[in-house]
UniProtKB/Swiss-Prot annotation:
It is found in: Membrane. Residues 685-707 have a biased composition (Low complexity). Residues 1-21, 619-726 are annotated as: Disordered. This is Patatin-like phospholipase domain-containing protein An01g04180. It comes from Aspergillus niger (strain ATCC MYA-4892 / CBS 513.88 / FGSC A1513). GO terms for molecular function: triacylglycerol lipase activity.
Length: 749
């Protein structure tokens, strides 16, 4: 390492190099308003027994009056058999789950030893060590290609045929796209435009509308990227590159009018969908997200839509309120000097826990969190500053109320740091908090009638359905660091960028017997937890149903699992020092490297479509975004693109492309738990505040109308299979989407 490299490495540990390191963004009045909202219990009116008796008259209790039924008894409809069998059955099942957990541990140890002694030996082991030692993506790619050459994976790439995608359709489509693209280029050279119409360009648009769709012909199947360390089939890569070239050619073509291009790219955008980065909870394990974000940022594939829960919400807030240049200076080991949430001594937090039931002080966390959120920044202000769409999952303190996904559509004036605190309020760690809203004069007030919220990981760690509903997200990049989930992660046939090396990719991890035992034990534990939940036998410590921390979906289209170490569990509620944060940054980046090629191919098409859509929306005088897109900003140095901040891009796109609401065919969208999906704007606590909200938020009629639309596959069900209809009706009867084990189980094929 030369002198310049040593100096650069030293700067990453120097806190003075961090932007706004010494700046406190939050105003003291904001904290005082937050403190008042936390202590306000709500006024309860005094009610007399009647008009002439005193209020506090002494009233004798009637004898023989039946006691009011307890809530738990009323909910579970307890009877004699329930009372007699509940605890014996509960202890029996817990005993069996404990035995299964012990057997699962032994199975994983067997698989680990099998892979070390049978699979990873000799030359392949040395190449694997070189791969894991790389700290930047170009060097990692070289090491991955060397390992693929040794294992014979390069030959697999050269063979078009594969069971998990339609190679014949893709092969023919590549030939057609190339042929039509050459014809368009020839017409441009010969200037045969006539009246401005180009038959070849129109034919190319027709081809693009047919194939620019989510997972068209299976080209986005993760299995296509799970057979090699570097990349995918050569045919798939050729198809992605050709598709990108054709999209750019249509955008630059003068044989199509701007209005036609605008409509064309609107259709492509709706059909292809959007990509979102989802950051899970996991206490201080969430600091691995910094490395994942840094890897995506350095390679230009950081999505605009970001969601976070609990600890992941803090990372998401930092990313969504900073520009790319600021993030590159922030995501360094010196950032550890600003992470001071757990700096109190052991006697201090024990005494607080004894008095309040929570280990940490809410006001202190609000002060610390505000720096990551740039003070009392709202969701809309963050969107207007960076072009990124921040989403934070929050769960109401009432176990029966629906969860919310706070963003610039559902809660535009909600203060980000209050939502981050609510999403991190784990019972026993932090008490439920009140969301705060910023009024027109800049002061803060309680949001949603002062209701309190808590940790989003308890019910919706990865809000995939809400993201799809709000932003048409159908491709999710999940960074999963929950410690209780990482222990059970196992991919028997390999995962993206990490193929099974046993039998040259055709085998199973640990052999077929080891993988079969692992799957059986894991599914059996999941089954018994569901039985306990559906029979309402599980106790509710702190008034919370804790079964969802195991039974919800924790993965996405691409799931990144940073590799943790045992000491992370010891430091699960302590601040990292710069050395520990440097290791977490490095591990987070290395865990993202195998997934980058898959993500690059996806965003290569998405970015081309979105940039073209914004270009022609601006040219046609129809802006689609209240703030310039990040991708648009990077390619518009003069900042000519400055649309109105009142216009809502997603509402316009959805209202234009989705079918209009019809009088009699009204269908309300329901969430996973059978209740109504909560996509409404949070209600203000004051009438004045409500008027301010309505003036600042985007068109609420468009947002609410999306709740009452009839999905396309529900109209005209005559063409649907009778078996699909029986399955849907059965799911409605049993009220359990999870019985199919797939979020798409209720949708017809």
């Amino acid at each position: 390492m030369n002198g310049a490299e040593k100096s650069a490495a030293g700067d990453t540990y120097d806190p003075s190099t961090i932007p706004d390191y010494d700046r406190e963004f939050i105003h003291p009045d904001d904290l005082r308003q937050f403190e008042l909202a936390l202590t306000d219990q709500g006024a309860s009116p005094l009610v007399a027994l009647n008009d002439w008796r005193p209020i506090y008259q002494r009233v004798r209790r009637e004898r023989g009056r039946r006691k009011e039924p307890r809530r738990t008894k009323d909910e579970t409809r307890e009877g004699v058999l329930y009372t007699v069998l509940k605890w014996p059955f509960l202890f029996t099942v817990f005993g069996w789950i404990t035995a299964l957990a012990f057997a699962y541990t032994l199975t994983r140890v067997y698989i680990f030893l099998y892979e070390q002694w049978v699979t990873w030996r000799g030359r392949r082991q040395s190449l694997r060590r070189q791969l894991h030692a790389q700290t930047n993506y170009p060097d990692w790619q070289k090491a991955a290609r060397a390992l693929d050459d040794h294992l014979g994976n390069q030959r697999w790439k050269e063979i078009d045929e594969y069971a998990y995608y339609d190679h014949l359709t893709i092969s023919n489509l590549v030939k057609q796209l190339k042929k039509v693209r050459r014809e368009v280029e020839r017409e441009r050279r010969e200037k045969r435009r006539g009246s401005g119409q180009s038959p070849a360009a129109e034919e190319l648009c027709t081809l693009l509308e047919a194939c620019v769709k989510n997972n068209f012909a299976g080209v986005e199947n993760p299995r296509l990227y799970s057979e090699a360390y570097s990349g995918t089939k050569n045919l798939v890569q050729e198809y992605i590159d050709e598709l990108h070239a054709c999209i750019q050619l249509v955008a630059d073509s003068k044989g199509i009018t701007s209005e036609e291009k605008l409509q064309h790219f609107k259709h492509l955008d709706t059909n292809f969908g959007r990509t979102a980065l989802c950051l899970s909870g996991g206490a201080t394990f969430a600091y691995y997200h910094f490395g994942v974000v840094r890897a995506l940022l350095d390679n230009g594939v950081l999505p605009e839509i970001i969601t976070g829960t609990s600890g992941g919400a803090l990372v998401a807030a930092l990313v969504a309120t900073r520009t790319d240049e600021e993030l590159k200076q922030l995501l360094v080991p010196a950032l550890a000097h600003r992470i001071r949430a757990c700096q109190e001594s052991f006697p201090t937090w024990v005494w607080r826990w004894w008095r309040t039931g929570a280990r940490f002080d809410t006001l202190d966390w609000a002060r610390q969190c505000s720096w990551f959120c740039r003070g009392s920044t709202t969701f809309r202000e963050a969107y207007e500053r960076t072009g990124r769409i921040l989403n934070v999952s929050c769960v109401p303190s009432d176990p029966h109320s629906p969860t919310i996904l706070a963003n610039y559509l559902t809660s535009p004036n909600c203060v980000i740091w209050s939502a981050v605190l609510a999403s991190a309020a784990v019972p026993g760690i932090l008490n439920p908090v009140v969301l705060m809203t910023k009024k027109r004069d800049g002061t803060l007030a309680p949001y949603s009638f002062g209701h309190k919220w808590k940790d989003g990981s308890l019910r919706t760690d990865i809000p995939i359905k809400a993201l799809n509903l709000h932003f048409n997200v159908n491709f999710t990049i999940v960074s999963q660091v929950n410690p209780h989930i990482n222990l059970f992660f196992f991919s028997s046939r390999g995962t993206v960028g990490r193929p099974v090396t046993h039998r040259k990719g055709r085998g199973w991890r640990g052999g077929f017997l080891g993988s079969a035992i692992e799957q059986y034990i894991k599914l059996d534990m999941n089954k018994w937890l569901r039985v306990l939940r559906h029979l309402e036998l599980l106790p509710r410590p702190m008034g919370q149903d804790w079964s969802e921390i195991w039974l919800q979906k924790f993965s996405g289209t691409v799931t990144i699992w940073p590799k943790t170490i045992p000491s992370d569990f010891y430091h699960i509620l302590s601040d990292p020092n710069p050395e520990r944060l440097a290791r977490m940054l490095r591990v987070g980046q290395q865990s993202a490297f195998p997934k980058l090629q898959f993500i690059k191919n996806r965003l290569k098409i998405e970015i081309a479509v979105v940039k073209s859509l914004q270009k022609f929306a601006h040219a046609g005088g129809r802006p689609i975004s209240p703030a310039p897109s990040r991708w648009r900003q990077n390619n518009d140095p003069d900042n000519h693109y400055n649309p109105s901040p009142r216009t809502d891009p997603l509402n316009e796109r959805l209202d234009h492309n989705l079918p209009e609401r019809r009088g009699d065919n009204v269908n309300i969208t329901f969430g996973e738990g059978g209740g109504r999906e909560d996509t409404h704007l949070l209600d203000g606590s004051l009438s004045e505040n409500s008027s301010n909200e309505s003036a600042a938020r985007p068109s609420s009629s468009s947002s609410s109308s999306r709740l009452l639309r009839v999905p396309e596959h529900r109209r005209g069900s005559t063409g649907s299979s009778i078996f699909e209809e029986v399955r849907r009706q059965s799911a409605v009867f049993f009220d359990d989407v999870d019985m199919y084990g797939d979020d798409e189980a209720l949708r017809p094929g």
